[in-house]
Regions:
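Short membrane-interfacial helix/loop motifs at transmembrane-helix boundaries
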Residues: 24-72, 233-237
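N-terminal signal-anchor/first transmembrane alpha helix
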Residues: 1-32, 114
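Hydrophobic positions within alpha-helical transmembrane segments of bacterial inner-membrane proteins
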Residues: 26, 85-97, 101, 127, ...
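Transmembrane alpha-helices
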Residues: 13-14, 19-26, 166, 172-179, ...
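Transmembrane-helix boundary motif in ABC transporter permease subunits
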Residues: 1-6, 83-118, 131-138, 185-187, ...
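Membrane-interfacial helix termini and adjacent extracytoplasmic/periplasmic loops
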Residues: 40-47, 110-111, 127-166, 199, ...
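Individual transmembrane alpha-helix segments
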Residues: 65-91
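Short hydrophobic faces within alpha-helices
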Residues: 78, 103, 120, 178, ...
Length: 237
């Protein structure tokens, strides 16, 4: 066995262990949900059942909790989280793409400063971002008086979308930067020399090239928003 072959085998084993460690708890919890046993566990396995999705478990105070299918609060929370995630994707992807494109156009001396400012939101704790968003928009709503500004400034879903977008757009920015680093700028120059406008170059050359990054950043933004807690718990009023 060659050293290269041995390295590939060891790498495969390492990756398998890594993903097993990462997704193992999720797999165990998913399997446990279909065990009809009173105590949530894989062993002893009584029988495959949808019991806990329908009737739920008994709480410590003796009351029976609603099952997954009947838990209205869970349904409302899921729909709200989905709506917020879609809103964050709608804002974060264009913001990240625009910032990455600007980064490639600014002067080299300003590029480091612009890059540092663009990634700065991820350095702040989510708690700080959530509280800051609420405080800022509360002041704006107070100064705006009655009207749409006042309503938006006290709308939890709106504030949560803005708060999450502050740092999730940075993730999108980094994805677009990585993609643009491999972009051949001579394609734009050739198109401009042939009479294409800046809009045509952007739509027909740059956007198709960035489509993989757009898809990746949209997925990352959706997942980051859907599982976020620190920012959401302080901004969702």
């Amino acid at each position: 066995m060659t050293s290269n072959r041995a390295f590939q085998i060891l790498l495969g084993i390492y990756i398998s262990i890594f993903f097993l460690y990462l997704f193992g708890p999720l797999i165990i919890m998913s399997v446990t949900a279909f065990n009809s046993a009173e105590f949530p566990s894989i062993t002893p396995w009584e029988c495959f059942s949808f019991r806990w999705f329908n009737e739920g478990k008994i709480a410590y105070d003796g009351q029976r909790l609603a099952g997954l299918a009947a838990d209205r609060d869970l349904h409302v929370g899921f729909i709200t989280s989905l709506f917020i995630a879609l809103g964050v994707v709608t804002l974060s992807v264009p913001i990240g793409m625009s910032a990455a494109i600007v980064l490639t156009q600014v002067h080299s001396k300003l590029r480091t400063l612009f890059y540092s400012m663009s990634i700065m939101p991820v350095l702040f704790p989510g708690v700080v971002i959530g509280i800051s968003t609420v405080v800022l928009w509360d002041r704006i709503a107070t100064l705006g008086g009655e009207g749409i500004i006042s309503e938006l400034g006290r709308n939890g879903i709106f504030l949560t979308i803005l708060g999450q977008t502050c740092f999730i757009s940075t993730y999108c920015f980094l994805i677009f930067v990585a993609r643009l680093q491999r972009f051949d700028t001579t394609q734009e120059e050739a198109a401009l020399d042939l009479g294409a406008s800046q809009t045509q170059v952007f739509v027909k050359i740059l956007i198709p090239y960035l489509m993989p990054a757009i898809g990746s950043s949209a997925v990352i933004a959706f997942l980051a928003s859907f599982e976020n807690y620190n920012t959401t718990v302080f901004s969702i009023l």
